[in-house]
């Protein structure tokens, strides 16, 4: 099963995370299928960058979000509808 979860990067005591699509049974920092965003908790407030269309694509294919990623998803504003 695919999961959308955080993968830790950064130096000791200076965490920076990638939001990745990865098999559920892989290691936290293991090989991922796709990187769909980043999260830096050290800024005030924490900076979140998400490729919303890619996250929606993977969720439609059956990927599940971790609890933390769900909270980050709720914090990010939806992209405004393009005027065409």
UniProtKB/Swiss-Prot annotation:
Keyword flag Repressor: no
GO BP terms, alphabetized: translation
Protein name: Small ribosomal subunit protein bS16
Family: Belongs to the bacterial ribosomal protein bS16 family.
Pfam family, one: Ribosomal_S16
GO cellular component terms attached to this protein's record: cytoplasm; small ribosomal subunit
Gene3D superfamilies the record matches: 3.30.1320.10
InterPro entries (UniProt xref): Ribosomal_bS16, Ribosomal_bS16_CS, Ribosomal_bS16_dom_sf
Record organism: Koribacter versatilis (strain Ellin345)
Recorded GO MF terms: structural constituent of ribosome
Keywords from the UniProt entry: Ribonucleoprotein, Ribosomal protein
